[in-house]
Curated annotation (Swiss-Prot):
Transmembrane segments: none annotated. It comes from Caenorhabditis elegans. Its EC number is 1.13.11.6. The gene is haao-1. The lineage of its organism: Eukaryota, Metazoa, Ecdysozoa, Nematoda, Chromadorea. Residues 163-179 are annotated as: Linker. This is 3-hydroxyanthranilate 3,4-dioxygenase.
Amino acid sequence: MSGVTAIEIPQWIQDNQEDFVPPVCNKCMFSDQLKVFYVGGPNQRKDFHLEEGEEFFFQRKGDMVLKVIEKGQVRDLVIKQGEMFMLPARVEHSPQRFSNSIGLVVERERKNTEFDCVRFLVGSSNITLFERWFYLTDVVKDLPPLIKEFYGSNEFKTGKPGKGTFACNAPYEARWTDLPVPINRKEFIYDHISEVKNGPVRIYGAPEYKTEVMLLGEGSYDLESGTVELLIWLQENTFAVVEESGFTYAMKSETMVRIKPNTKCLLNVKGGFAITIRMPA
C-alpha cells in the first residue's frame, strides 16, 4: 500500500463548499497523526482553547482574528490573507472567523497523557468563569457537550465564578511568553529566493518549536517522515513529482501531499516551491 496521499486543494475546497459556512464551518482533509483542516465562517467563538501541541495557521482567503492570552492579557492577533502563524503550545486562544474567509489549520494528534482545556472568561477579563479539561479525540464530537454544559451552568446564568467553575486541578499552566508576528508567505518566499537555491530554508522550527516547517525550492529532495506524518504543500505555479515504493506521482500546484509515518520518498520540485510540515509530539 502506498504511503502517499495527494489532494488538489482548490478542487477539494470547491467540492466541500457547503461545509465552510454555519453551522459546520470546517472540513477535515486528513485526520490521522496530523489533523489537517480548512475553516470558514462566520464563527465567533466565546471560549478559549488550551492544548499541549502547536498549531499552524494559514489564511487562504480573507483575514481572521486569533484572540490570545499573552502574558496574562487578552489581545487580538490578526492573521491576514496570505499570512502564516505558528501558535506555541499551551497558549490560550480563541479563533474568530468571518464570512467569505477560509483558512488552513494543522495540528497533531494528542498523546494519551495530554489534555486539552475549554475555558470561558468573565467578560473581557482574564478571570476564569468556567473551564473543563478533557482528552481530545474528535473536536467535532468532544467540544459540543462541554459547551452545552457551560450554557446550562449557574456560572453562565450569573456571569460570576462559582462552585462549578472548576471540575479538577489544572494538569498544567498556560504559557507565559511573547508571541511572534504572522509571516506573509509570498514575502517570505521572495526574501529567500537566493537562499532556497542552496537547500531548504527553515520557516518555523527548533529551538522555539517542536514543529518543523521548511521552504523547498526547485530541486530533488530525499525525504523521510520518521515516526510521524509529513505534509508536502505545493505552492502556486509549482509542478512536482514524488517517487515512493516504486510508484511515481506527478502533482500540480496547490496540492497537499501526506506522507505516512516511516516512509521514504524522493520529491522532485520541477518549478516553484513547496512547504513541508512535521509535527512530532
